[in-house]
Amino acid sequence: MGARASVLTGGKLDRWEKVRLRPGGRKRYMMKHLVWASRELERFACDPGLMESKEGCTKLLQQLEPALKTGSEGLRSLFNTLAVLWCIHSDITVEDTQKALEQLKRHHGEQQSKTESNSGSREGGASQGASASAGISGNYPLVQNAQGQMVHQAISPRTLNAWVKVVEEKAFSPEVIPMFSALSEGALPQDVNTMLNAVGGHQGAMQVLKEVINEEAAEWDRLHPTHAGPIAPGQLREPRGSDIAGTTSTLQEQIGWTTANPPIPVGDVYRRWVILGLNKVVRMYCPVSILDIRQGPKEPFRDYVDRFYKTLRAEQASQEVKNWMTDTLLVQNANPDCKQILKALGPGATLEEMMTACQGVGGPSHKARVLAEAMSMVQNQGRADVFFQKGQGAGPKRKIKCFNCGKEGHLARNCKAPRRKGCWRCGQEGHQMKDCTGRQVNFLGKGWPSRSGRPGNFVQNRTEPTAPPIESYGYQEEEKSQEKKEGESSLYPPTSLKSLFGSDPSSQ
């Protein structure tokens, strides 16, 4: 950390620690901000040693400035930190970050006006060429030397190392495209080819990329046909598709086309072709469709949003279609818990409001809250049911009857009539109704227990099933007579009157 923190020492460090992060804020710049900035520069394949001088900070600011429009919040913070550091090296006193940015912008405007005035003092074509060169003198990798000439600065090994590491780790995932766009900002076709040739693996993907470049080069030749006739001395020829791809053009020709008046940005055109090919390769390496991205039942909404937008970056569609996918599929493919919350927010909710509302959904606290709400609803419903049963029953109200006087509308304990003596059931004295042994009745109003030995709610006389008579053939009649005799004999018990009187002539 000592090497990183040695960017500022002495009085410069004291002035650095007096600068506020925000206008009117309490927090100020500290040593840790310098350490963080050096680490971020290494991550962006830049040399942290340039932070030790004013010229180095100027180079870093020129390299980071083109990516500010599409850069992240971390990139803007890095640019602001370098702007304050540039003011410290330039002995410009500033109070906060906003003042430092204003000083940097003012200085940049003065330098640009000086460059334009110097270029306007030159004569003829040299004046036009110098003014065109001054307009892009800050663009990497073309820099202006002390003699005012545009020279090419080769791509650094740090940039190549960062590019190769991204390809090896990400394997053409959607984030490879913005990384290539950032590393190749302002590069010439020769620099872009150097970056592509540095990729050792994934040769199948590189072949697909080469086919896309050839198709775009053929389309360029069709839309930009060459003019017939000889080329004037000192005039550059018009670039063909193969010249833009860097296969049939030299480095000096590429610099000449880029710095011509009007310029032909062959590097930007070639980068656009490569990005088209990378989009095709990313779609090949990431076959997952945005329609298949669904939130799991226990997946946090933040992770689901990250997966959704990562897949959305790989989708080859217009911005209008992507906006429709975001507005529709992001809510439609969420889990039921988050979907209920998102629908309650309405269609005009922002992503920040969605993530804030769905924060913690699926976790232990959310489950406990849902369980508590469900139990509260059940308890409230139970209280309402009990109140309904006690207060206002669904059926007709039962009339009460007094056992003492026999009138309705009051109970016996509230009866004002004289107390009736004896049992209220049988009318006899000597016992109460609860001890009455009189005849009881069942729910049918009949005596209990039944005298017939069978409860009164059973059928007393059961009819036997009948069948058609059987045809008689003689021997069946004999069997019937025998059965009849057996039946008659079974009616009498073993000890009958016949055995008492012996041979009774009337019984024969």
UniProtKB/Swiss-Prot annotation:
The record marks 140-141, 371-372, 387-388, 442-443, 458-459 as: Cleavage. GO terms for cellular component: host cell cytoplasm; host cell nucleus; host cell plasma membrane; membrane; viral nucleocapsid. The keyword Transmembrane does not apply. Residues 104-133, 446-508 are annotated as: Disordered. The lineage of its organism: Viruses, Riboviria, Pararnavirae, Artverviricota, Revtraviricetes. A motif (PTAP/PSAP motif) lies at residues 465-468. A motif (LYPX(n)L motif) lies at residues 491-500. A zinc finger (CCHC-type) spans 400-417, 421-438. Late-budding domains (L domains) are short sequence motifs essential for viral particle budding. They recruit proteins of the host ESCRT machinery (Endosomal Sorting Complex Required for Transport) or ESCRT-associated proteins. p6-gag contains one L domain: a PTAP/PSAP motif, which interacts with the UEV domain of TSG101. Matrix protein p17 targets Gag and Gag-Pol polyproteins to the plasma membrane via a multipartite membrane binding signal, that includes its myristoylated N-terminus. Also mediates nuclear localization of the preintegration complex. Implicated in the release from host cell mediated by Vpu. Capsid protein p24 forms the conical core of the virus that encapsulates the genomic RNA-nucleocapsid complex. This is Gag polyprotein.
